[in-house]
Amino acid sequence: MSKLVISTSIFQSQVADLLPCNNHQKSQLTYSLINAYDLLQHFDEVLTFPYARKDDLLEFHSKSYIDYLINGRFNKMMAQDVNNPMVESKWSELSELADNWNEKIDYNPSQDLQRFTTRENLYNYYLNHSQALENNMDCINNSEVPTNDKPTDTYILNSETKQYNLEGDCPIFSYLPMYCQVITGATLNLLDHLSPTERLIGINWDGGRHHAFKQRASGFCYINDVVLLIQRLRKAKLNKITYVDFDLHHGDGVEKAFQYSKQIQTISVHLYEPGFFPGTGSLSDSRKDKNVVNIPLKHGCDDNYLELIASKIVNPLIERHEPEALIIECGGDGLLGDRFNEWQLTIRGLSRIIINIMKSYPRAHIFLLGGGGYNDLLMSRFYTYLTWCVTKQFSNLRCGDNNSFQIDPFDVCDGDDSEQFIREHDLVEMYNEENYQYWIYEMEGSSRMKMLRNDNKDRDMVELMKFYEL
């Protein structure tokens, strides 16, 4: 039996969508769709207000970096947002859409299901419902800008922004400290339910920030929650841990943190081509006598090829390590329909691979984290379907005679995907241009399904197997 725990809520999703690359919507779309399919009722615990203290972040990151990153002067509206009212309007767009839906169906959501219409309201809720002020005064109020001052970027135009790479794809954005502490907490708080007598399966689709380094941000990642999770697991006396990364990009931050550890195995399956971020993760970077495993793939990888990679290389290497805990980074930027347009995995295919790995290690604690994915509507479908797969396979609450679980929403008769539409819910109109079809990116004949040339060959797999002595 497994205990299923997920960290998700309207609050968490709106905080997650402060991240610029989330386009004010990625996490909220996912949360709403998971709710539309009634999946949260299958979990033993749903964490709704995650939080990580400053000391938690310091278990991996340097003090100078954390002191700067979560300083209270950034827990406010930055000047670039104050001077651009369109940004706030865009941020509140989903709230307005949800309100219109609720009014249409005459539904009055409870307070915990109401969205925050401004980021300032979101932050006030954060202050009122956390112990941040009490336990972490230094990171909330240190160098706080007086409230009657106009927001200004003067504070951030200095050498430290360059030193910590807080520019380019990792800019300082409004309420950055709140974002870092909530989203990191969403991963770490899963461990509150760790027990030596029961297998834990924990999920945080807003986590998996695998590019962040000890002293700098990188690739949209500010705090490396994966590394912090592994450190916590080690403190809990779980010594042998495996990290598997299916993101399109190499999991460089996690790999570097544990590159000399004999107890921590890192496996990254990623695109490796000249000029592709982050430029690391070649086969030569791996160390056969250590636990650094890189599986560099080429353009066009599909379900069949990745399933072979998983069965012939990934699983045997995990078995060799015999982990007590397994962390899987479930990035979706390799899916058909993602803006990178590099791989052609399907939602069903990638989910099947992940579930098969989970089933192969019934005694290991398992943590599923999010990752890349730059088609927000596609990602909401992926994480909703994968969540359903996890509950279908592992939820204790689905066992026995429970009438509420009689119908599985993704069981399609005769394989006819064309008749399966997104369920009605508060954000369903976001899927209007895709005709509300759930599988539009995988349907034969769909204008959204664009097949790619697969440059990965059987000989490449043979080379990988030979390198890892399989």
From Swiss-Prot:
Q: Where is this region: Histone deacetylase?
A: 47-392
Question: What biological-process terms (Gene Ontology) are attached?
Answer: heterochromatin formation; positive regulation of transcription by RNA polymerase II
Active site: which residues?
H211
Residue ranges annotated as coiled coil are none
User: Per the record, what are the reactions this protein catalyses?
Assistant: N(6)-acetyl-L-lysyl-[histone] + H2O = L-lysyl-[histone] + acetate
Q: Which SUPFAM superfamilies does UniProt cross-reference here?
A: Arginase/deacetylase
Further comment: Present with 538 molecules/cell in log phase SD medium.
Provide the protein name. Histone deacetylase HOS1
Organism (species): Saccharomyces cerevisiae (strain ATCC 204508 / S288c)
